[in-house]
Every structure is written in structure tokens, then in C-alpha cells.
Amino acid sequence: NSYKNKKILITGAGGSIGKELCIQILHLQPKQIILIDNSEYSLYLTNLVLDTLKKSHSYKTNIISLLKSINNSDTMKDTFTRYKPEIVFHAAAYKHVSLVETNPIESIKNNVFGSLNVIKAALYSNVKQFILISTDKAVRPSNVMGATKRLSEIILQSYVSNKIDIEYNIVRFGNVIGSRASVIPLFNYQIKQ
């Protein structure tokens, strides 16, 4: 168990993928999980689930919930400096294709520049492992969301490819059943209509 007694930071902790990562990682009993999300309600729900699991399993993991935006580079740098995570899961992103298409500037700010802020903060604080959660839409992107995620992958690769003291991974998910960006609820809605 390479996560036991480690400090792990998860961006997008209130999202469907981020929340599930938090749950699974808690079962590995890290020393600390630092949750970052810009949605108060989503962060609250994730924290509630983790607190319940922590009590029911008598885990000693320290859970820190931070209502923060990845779009503020100073905030990210300060957060990483203060909590000194060893492992980072970067799951924060705007992912609803139709909304990203109609709000490309905000999506680029969040998915590209926000990712850059997280990557730079991680390198500044000497993170040992960085996992970027991406999408299958980053392969030959045909929409803004796919392009922003592909750019975040390229940025990560360019910043860490020549570093020997950090392990990095990019995980591309397809359509995740049960996630808030899944096409399944849309299909169900259309069938009911």
C-alpha cells in the first residue's frame, strides 16, 4: 500500500470522480487527505461521506476540506506549501461538453491555466507523484473540452518529463457511468421524453 501514512491532495474532490477517489484512498489509510473544490455543497457532501467512513472504520486519517479555486496560482502555491502533499490527484475540471463549448474562455482558464497552477505548485513543493485525471476526448480533440484536457496533459508532460524526482501519470476516462458528466442520464432523459 503505497498510500498508507502519506499526505494526499485531491483537486475536484467534490466532483463525481474526485469524490470516488477520496473514498477509495481513505480505505488505504493515508496520513492526510487534503480535499480541494470550489463548490461548497459538493465539498460538504464529500466531507460528510468521508467523515462517516472514517468513524465507521476507525481510520486515523486527517481530512482537510479546503474551499478553493485552482485558478488562483498564489492560493495553490500557498496551499501546497502549507500542507506539503506527497501525492496529488488533479481531478478538477469543467467537463460538460455543451457548457464548455458555450463558455470556452472560462473553460480554458479552469482546465488549462488552473491545471498549470496545480502543476507548478506541485513542483514547487516537491510532490513525489502527480496523477492527472483526463478524458478520452483528449485524443484527437474535436471540441473545446477535449482540447483543454489535451493541453493540460501536454503542460504536465512538458513540466515533469525531465524530472527524475516525480512520478507522473495521466489517466484518461471514457464515459463514466454514474458521473455527473455521463451521457447515460441524458439518454435516460431523452428516452422518457
Over which residues does each language-model region extend?
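Conserved catalytic-core motifs of eukaryotic protein kinase domains, centered on the activation segment
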Residues: 98-103, 143-144
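Conserved NAD(P)H cofactor-binding loop of Rossmann-fold oxidoreductase domains
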Residues: 67, 91-95, 134-136
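Hydrophobic/aromatic anchor residues within beta-strands of the central parallel beta-sheet
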Residues: 65, 107, 130, 168-171
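NAD(P)-dependent short-chain dehydrogenase/reductase
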Residues: 51, 120-123, 144-193
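NAD(P)-cofactor binding segment of oxidoreductase domains
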Residues: 32-39, 81-82, 87, 102-130
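N-terminal Rossmann/SDR dinucleotide-binding element
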Residues: 1-86
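Conserved sequence/active-site signature of Rossmann-fold short-chain dehydrogenase/reductase
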Residues: 71, 138, 176-178
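Hydrophobic, well-structured modules enriched for small/aliphatic residues and gly/pro motifs
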Residues: 95, 139-141, 180
